[in-house]
Regions:
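Residue-level recognition of well-ordered beta-strand positions that form the cores
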Residues: 79-81, 123-125, 139-141, 155, ...
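Conserved N-terminal beta-strand and adjoining loop/helix that marks the start
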Residues: 96-100
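HotDog/MaoC-like acyl-thioester-processing domains
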Residues: 1-45, 130-132, 143-205
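Short beta-strand micro-motifs enriched in acidic
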Residues: 70-72, 141-145
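Hydrophobic core residues within well-ordered beta-strands of beta-rich domains
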Residues: 65, 118-120, 136, 150, ...
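Catalytic strand-loop segment that frames the active site of acyl-thioester-processing enzymes
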Residues: 3-4, 50-93
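Hydrophobic beta-strand-centered segment that forms part of the acyl-chain substrate-binding groove
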Residues: 23, 29, 104-137, 142-143
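A conserved beta-turn-beta hairpin within the catalytic core of GNAT-like acetyltransferases
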Residues: 77, 115-117, 148-150
C-alpha cells in the first residue's frame, strides 16, 4: 500500500494520507477528480479493460476471481458465485476474498465519475457467512470527494433475499490527470452498454 499511495499522489510522504489532517493536505495538491458522470442510473455499462493479471478482475490470472464489473449511475456492481478454491471454513468463502470483492467494487465506483484511484484504507464488517456456489452481489459507491481523497462504501448482498452479508468503507487516492490518462491507455479502459440486469437491491447511495 505504501508504494501505491506514494505513486498515486506523486510526492514523498503521502503514506500518511489516511491520517486525518494529512489526508486533507495531500489531497490539496495536484488535480482533483473530474466529477464528470459517465454513467447514469438505469443505464448499466460494463467495464472493459485489456487482458491483465489482477486477482479480482484479470482474465489472465488463472487463480483469480474473474469478476465482471459494471457501473450504473454512481455505483459499481458485480455478481458472482464463488467456487470451492476460495473456501475458508467448510462451505464458506474466505474472508479475504470477501474483502477483495468489496475493495474492487469501491475502487471501480470511481470510474462512474471518470476517475481512477488506489486504496489507502479499507474497513470491513462481516454480517453473515458467504456460502460457496451461491450467487452474491457486490455494490460499491462514492460517499464523498475532497480533492483527490475519495470516500466510498460497499456491501455484499444475497440478490435472492436482499440480506446484507458484509459491508465496508474505504478511502482512495485519485490519480492525477496525467497518471489517469496513462492507466486508461495502458489498460485500454472503456465502458460499453451492458446486457446484464443492473437492478440494485436497494439501500443507501
Amino acid at each position: 500500500m505504501t508504494s501505491e499511495v506514494r505513486e498515486a499522489t506523486g510526492r514523498r510522504g503521502t503514506t500518511e494520507a489516511v491520517d486525518g489532517a494529512s489526508a486533507s493536505a495531500s489531497a490539496s495538491e495536484g488535480d482533483a477528480p473530474t466529477g464528470r458522470v459517465v454513467s447514469v442510473p438505469g443505464n448499466s455499462l460494463t467495464i472493459e479493460v485489456a487482458p491483465h493479471r489482477c486477482f479480482a478482475c484479470g482474465a489472465l490470472n488463472e487463480h483469480g476471481i474473474h469478476l465482471d464489473l459494471h457501473v450504473d449511475g454512481d455505483r459499481c456492481w458485480t455478481e458472482v458465485a464463488l467456487p470451492e478454491r476460495f473456501q475458508g471454513w467448510d462451505g464458506i468463502a474466505h474472508g479475504g476474498i470477501i474483502c477483495t470483492i468489496l475493495d474492487e467494487v469501491m475502487a471501480w465506483s470511481l470510474a462512474a465519475t471518470d476517475n481512477w484511484g488506489l486504496t489507502a484504507r479499507l474497513s470491513v464488517d462481516f454480517k453473515r457467512p458467504v456460502r460457496l456456489g451461491v450467487a452474491i452481489r457486490g455494490e460499491g459507491w462514492i460517499t464523498s470527494v475532497r480533492r483527490r481523497i475519495v470516500e466510498t462504501a460497499a456491501r455484499i448482498v444475497d440478490p435472492a433475499t436482499g440480506e446484507v452479508l458484509a459491508t465496508a468503507t474505504a478511502t482512495y487516492v485519485a490519480a492525477d490527470s496525467a497518471r489517469k490518462a496513462e492507466l486508461q491507455a495502458r489498460y485500454r479502459f472503456r465502458l460499453t452498454p451492458s446486457a446484464a440486469d443492473a437492478g440494485s437491491s436497494g439501500g443507501p447511495a
